[in-house]
Structures are given as C-alpha cells and as structure tokens.
Amino acid sequence: MTMGDKKSPTRPKRQAKPAADEGFWDCSVCTFRNSAEAFKCSICDVRKGTSTRKPRINSQLVAQQVAQQYATPPPPKKEKKEKVEKQDKEKPEKDKEISPSVTKKNTNKKTKPKSDILKDPPSEANSIQSANATTKTSETNHTSRPRLKNVDRSTAQQLAVTVGNVTVIITDFKEKTRSSSTSSSTVTSSAGSEQQNQSSSGSESTDKGSSRSSTPKGDMSAVNDESF
C-alpha cells in the first residue's frame, strides 16, 4: 500500500460553538444583557430596540409650521365671500325663471266681469264691520254687574282678616230703611180700605132702616084720616 492510499481515521468534525453574544441584547438605558426571548428589559422594563438618542430640532421646519398655523385661518373667509357672490348671481337667474311662469298664469286667468267692479269697494264693507264690532264692544262694556238695591252704601264697615300672608277685607252693609216705611204704608192702606168698606156697609144699613120706618107712619096717617 502506498502512502496515498492510507485513509485518515474517521473522527467527528468539531461543531462550531455558539458565540457567547448570539441572541443576547444589551439594554440601551441600563446596559443590562437580556436573553433573546425577553422583549423587555428585566430591570428597567424598557422595550427592545428603543434608542436614547435625542432628536435634533430643525429651526427652519419649526418656523414653517408656525407660519402655516397662523396663516391658515384667512382662506375660509375668501371661500365664504365666493359662496355669497355665487348665491347673489343665482338669485337673478331664478327670478328670471320664475317671472315667465307667473306671466303665463296671469294670462290664463279669465277677466272679471264689469258687474264685480261696480260692486261696493271692500273698504266700505270693512268699515261697516268695524262699526258693528265697536257697537258690540261698547254694549258689552256698558253692561254693569248686578248690584243689590236694598243695601245702604253709606253704612259700610270693613273688617280685615289676616291668615298667614293673605289679608282679606270684608265689608258689611246695612239694609235700607225704605223697606220698613213701605211695609207701614201697605198696612195703613189696607186699614183704610177696611174702614171704607165698613162705612159703606153702615150707610147701606141706615138707608134700609129709614125706609122701613117711613112706611108704617104713612099707613097710620091714612087710617086716622079715614076715621075722622
């Protein structure tokens, strides 16, 4: 056997060892080395991949943003003005469209006869109605409330009664004295009528008595004459 035909003994190849830093990540805040499975730092709870670099402010961009904020309000006013102008322009066009239709309607209407024109104008009818209304209102105003007639208004006594915060005034009136005089006059008139009836009955009785007394005397005188 030659030297080239010799085979090296079979040995398993060495596997590459995993690097010590593979899969681990350092926290950007506390520099703690966390495992690959952790998505947050186990000490400060900062998420994986957060950067602590402060952003640099660009002064030009800031100036442009401020200018845009203050410059944006005026444009809406122009839009409003444009809307108003458009509305003003549209109005006369609408009026033009409406006016011919109105004229057509007026032409289609029939002309009123002359008899309607000769009638009384509406102003006179309105004046008559208003006069009637005023007379009715005046009549209603003149109608006064019913008042007691047998009350003497001069004898008024007022009594004030207060219940809580409410005060009530009560007025007492006395009856008129005419009622008593009228009753006495009726009594006297009835008494006078009774006296007249009695006097008339007495006169009738006296007349009857005189007629009775006169007849026997005449008879007696006639008898005496015959005797003589």
Swiss-Prot record:
GO terms for molecular function: DNA binding; nucleic acid binding; transcription coregulator activity; transcription corepressor activity; zinc ion binding. InterPro entries: RYBP/YAF2, YAF2_RYBP, Znf_RanBP2, Znf_RanBP2_sf. One of its GO terms (cellular component) is nucleus. PROSITE patterns: ZF_RANBP2_1, ZF_RANBP2_2. The modification Phosphoserine is found at S99, S123, S127, S130, S227. SUPFAM superfamilies: Ran binding protein zinc finger-like (SSF90209). A zinc finger (RanBP2-type) spans 21-50. This is RING1 and YY1-binding protein. It comes from Homo sapiens (Human).
